[in-house]
UniProtKB/Swiss-Prot annotation:
Essential for the control of the cell cycle at the G2/M (mitosis) transition. Pfam families: Cyclin_C, Cyclin_N. The keyword NADP does not apply. GO terms for biological process: cell division. Interacts with the CDK1 protein kinase to form a serine/threonine kinase holoenzyme complex also known as maturation promoting factor (MPF). The cyclin subunit imparts substrate specificity to the complex. The keyword Ribosomal protein does not apply. This is G2/mitotic-specific cyclin-B. InterPro entries: Cyclin, Cyclin-like_dom, Cyclin-like_sf, Cyclin_C-dom, Cyclin_N, Cyclins_cyclin-box. The lineage of its organism: Eukaryota, Metazoa, Echinodermata, Eleutherozoa, Asterozoa. Keywords: Cell cycle, Cell division, Cyclin, Mitosis. Coiled coil: none annotated. Gene3D superfamilies: Cyclin-like. SMART domains: CYCLIN, Cyclin_C. Residues 360-394 are annotated as: Disordered.
Length: 394
């Protein structure tokens, strides 16, 4: 069988296809199969597999691995244009860097001595130290409270709004008043904090100062300003603001306006609010909760008035001073002058404007001061009226 097979293979030069070779190999014995493949010029490589050591089913091709290794050795590194001009830094002189000593821990007795000296100085001026009893409460920061309020006044001057920005706008003062009346209703509907309302109007004025806004986009700017200002634990979703505008704007438009406002303000939203200074003035004056709440209401009345845009912390001091119209025992003491940084003569014109504004809002204020709902409804328009007014200016 071997002789006959070899004679046939040697006598013919045939071109076998792969399927034919496989078929012939299967029909031959192992010895004849090896001889048959040699005649065809095929190199048979059998990868041996260990029983226990090698558990992979992939046969390693030593020839391909050697070829790849040879290619890697021949391949050289070429410098790019960016690195060809670099010089070696080996051997250059490097100056030693001085070690920075960590500061020594501060002696708390020195801090206490400094606070006592400060208290003694202001007492000699006839000013009460309103922070002397707050040293045990770390949340009140009595050691730094004066520096904090100085920095807040610096921020107040840095982000001050121009008083003539409305002259460069298509909108008018009346449109701004209508928008703020509507925002007050939205603020009440969503049960937001009072700081949110003041911050909303502040963001609105600062954006209108630097951007040209059309009538059709005014409500969008207002509602987006409240969305940014409502940084609270419980806040309204964007869909709620879309609904409150009667679907006049979409979620995408509100998000786009949010980006525009933040870029225009350079993400600086930390301008102090007048309500922050009111707390300081109320503490310096030792006023009760009734006068403090009345002062906050007077400040709310000024939100819709464009003529009060130029005032910042003066509004808080003037609002507190305005309560003297209902309480003649209220005095503007040296402590109030020191902590508010305003004298009674400086606040006089602002107090007169607030008095006129209060009389316009409430013809007989003494009969309604204790009724918060009547006060709010008499000043601000209802939700339906505000919505109709806004639709009329679009």
């Amino acid at each position: 069988m071997q002789t006959a097979c070899s004679g046939n293979l040697c006598g013919y030069q045939l071109m076998f296809s792969l399927s034919t070779v496989v078929t012939v190999c299967r029909s031959l014995r192992s010895r004849n199969r090896h001889w048959f493949l040699k005649l065809l010029g095929v190199r048979l490589t059998i990868a041996m597999r260990c029983a226990l050591e090698n558990i992979s089913n992939v046969a390693k091709n030593n020839v391909q691995a050697a070829a790849k290794k040879e290619i890697k050795q021949k391949r050289g590194m070429t410098k790019s244009k960016a690195t060809s001009s670099l010089q070696s830094v080996i051997g250059l002189h490097v100056e030693p860097v001085e070690k920075v000593q960590s500061p020594e821990p501060m002696d708390m007795s020195e801090v206490s001595n400094a606070l006592e000296a400060f208290s003694q100085n202001i007492l000699e001026m006839g000013v009460d130290d309103i922070d002397k009893d707050d040293h045990e409460n770390p949340q009140l920061c009595s050691e730094y409270v004066n520096d904090i309020y100085l920095y807040m006044r610096h921020l107040e001057r840095e982000f001050k709004v121009r008083t003539d920005y409305m002259a460069m706008q298509e909108i008018t003062e009346r449109m701004r008043t209508i928008l703020i009346d509507w925002l007050v209703q939205v603020h009440l509907r969503f049960h937001l904090l009072q700081e949110t309302l003041f911050l909303t109007i502040q963001i609105l004025d600062r954006y209108l100062e630097g951007a040209s806004v059309s009538k059709t986009k005014l409500q969008l700017v207002g509602v987006t300003s409240m969305l940014i200002a409502a940084y609270e634990e419980m806040y309204a979703e964007i869909g709620d603001f879309v609904y409150i505008t009667d679907n006049a704007y979409s979620k995408a438009q509100i998000r786009a306006m949010e980006c525009n406002i933040l870029r225009k303000l350079d993400f600086n939203l930390g301008k102090p609010l007048c309500i922050h200074f009111l707390r300081r003035c109320s503490k310096a004056g030792g006023v009760d909760g009734h006068k403090h709440t009345l002062s906050k209401y007077i400040m709310e009345l000024t939100l819709x008035e464009y003529s009060f845009v130029k005032y910042d912390x003066e509004i808080a001091a003037a609002a507190l001073l305005s309560t003297r119209f209902w309480d003649e025992d209220m005095e503007w003491t040296k402590s109030l002058v020191h902590y508010s940084a305003y004298s009674e003569g400086h606040l006089g014109p602002i107090v007169q404007k607030m008095a006129v504004l209060s009389q316009q809002s409430h013809p007989s204020p003494n009969s309604r001061l204790d009724q918060e709902e009547d006060m709010a409804s008499s000043k601000f328009m209802s939700d339906q009226q505000a919505t109709q007014e806004l639709k009329s200016i679009r």
